[in-house]
């Protein structure tokens, strides 16, 4: 039955990642405000007939985004953005069901023990918070300024990442062998760097969501400098101000600084793993190197080519891949 538990956790992880990626595409295509109602139960089916599509389109037209951004949009164009948002919401519902129904089964079968159930309940509560946060985010854009709050967008993403983190950590603990290393070998440094890397990846994902929410990737499309300067001229004289977090230039600059910081931390982690001279940790170091390289490359490509959807989605996906490898590393060290 432990194999079934492992398969379930893996399925949940895949579903959460799919939800994150589709959510990212929804943001990149400005589709998030196409469904102007929150119907958790009755909204599981899309419009089928011409009349129901027209009714949904009429609801959309009643909100500012249509007149301010998409005035003159055809029904076919509306269907595209509507279905993207619909698939994103449907994935959220499906992921919740795929999580809760087997959870009940595994608990009453005794596969999930009482000592472990609290952490699973926390994940369940996070799913509920995530659903509410998604609508709270959408609601922020159904106003005179038709753009969702970039802060709410970032928290919506971070909650999904926390859910993935908790599920993936359980998956790794459930299916990976422990690390057999002599007790005299000190793993304190790799452990510290792995914790620091996880924390920095969270910061970067949050900053990346702010960049997406402010369309900050569409300015200063050069690398490594911003308009010929390391620090862009717009923020040199006003660096410490909360208002900067509403400024696309500032947010992009901080996201770049985060990328440099994360690279240093992950490289330090890789070096500390290689010094242990353990085959399994060497493998982790190799995967970390590949994940970091691809993540940095997709980030630069996304910037230089004005945020193409494929590159931006790959950049988001490899942030999750990099996080996964670091969580795997942390689990191996912590449980050795």
From Swiss-Prot:
It is a multi-pass membrane protein. Heme binds at residues 255, 315. GO terms for cellular component: plasma membrane. Its EC number is 1.17.99.9. Pfam families: COX15-CtaA. The keyword Chaperone does not apply. It is found in: Cell membrane. InterPro entries: COX15/CtaA_fam, HemeA_Synthase_type2. It catalyses: Fe(II)-heme o + 2 A + H2O = Fe(II)-heme a + 2 AH2. Its cofactor is heme b. One of its GO terms (biological process) is heme A biosynthetic process. PANTHER family: CYTOCHROME C OXIDASE ASSEMBLY PROTEIN COX15, CYTOCHROME C OXIDASE ASSEMBLY PROTEIN COX15 HOMOLOG. Interacts with CtaB. Catalyzes the conversion of heme O to heme A by two successive hydroxylations of the methyl group at C8. The first hydroxylation forms heme I, the second hydroxylation results in an unstable dihydroxymethyl group, which spontaneously dehydrates, resulting in the formyl group of heme A. HAMAP family: HemeA_synth_type2 (MF_01665). This is Heme A synthase. The gene is ctaA.
């Amino acid at each position: 039955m432990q194999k079934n538990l492992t398969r379930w956790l893996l399925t949940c992880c895949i579903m959460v990642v799919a939800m994150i990626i589709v959510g990212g595409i929804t943001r990149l295509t400005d589709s998030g405000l196409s469904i102007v109602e929150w119907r958790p139960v009755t909204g599981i089916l899309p419009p089928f007939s011409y009349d129901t599509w027209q009714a949904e389109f009429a609801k959309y037209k009643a909100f500012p985004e249509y007149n301010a951004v998409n005035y003159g949009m055809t029904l076919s164009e509306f269907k595209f953005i509507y279905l993207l948002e619909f698939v994103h919401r449907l994935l959220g519902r499906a992921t919740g069901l795929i999580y809760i129904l087997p959870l009940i089964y595994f608990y009453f079968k005794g596969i999930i023990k009482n000592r472990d159930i609290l952490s699973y309940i926390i994940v369940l509560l996070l799913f509920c918070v995530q659903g509410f946060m998604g609508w709270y985010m959408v609601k922020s854009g159904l106003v005179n300024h038709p753009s969702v709050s970039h802060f709410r967008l970032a928290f919506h993403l971070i909650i999904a990442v926390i859910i993935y983190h908790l599920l993936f950590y359980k998956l790794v603990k459930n299916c990976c062998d422990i690390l057999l290393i002599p007790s005299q070998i000190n793993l304190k440094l790799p452990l510290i760097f792995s914790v620091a890397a996880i924390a920095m990846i969270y910061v970067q994902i949050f900053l990346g969501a702010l960049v997406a929410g402010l369309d900050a990737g569409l300015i200063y499309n050069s690398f490594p400098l911003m308009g010929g300067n390391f620090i862009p001229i717009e923020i040199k004289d006003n660096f410490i101000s909360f208002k900067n977090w509403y400024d696309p230039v500032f947010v992009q600059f901080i996201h770049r600084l985060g990328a440099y910081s994360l690279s240093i931390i992950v490289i330090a982690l890789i070096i500390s793993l290689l010094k242990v001279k353990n085959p399994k940790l060497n493998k982790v170091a190799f995967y970390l190197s590949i994940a970091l390289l691809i993540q940095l490359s997709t980030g630069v490509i996304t910037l230089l080519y004005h945020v193409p959807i494929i590159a931006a989605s790959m950049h988001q996906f490899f942030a999750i891949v990099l996080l996964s490898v670091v969580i795997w590393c942390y689990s191996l060290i912590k449980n050795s």
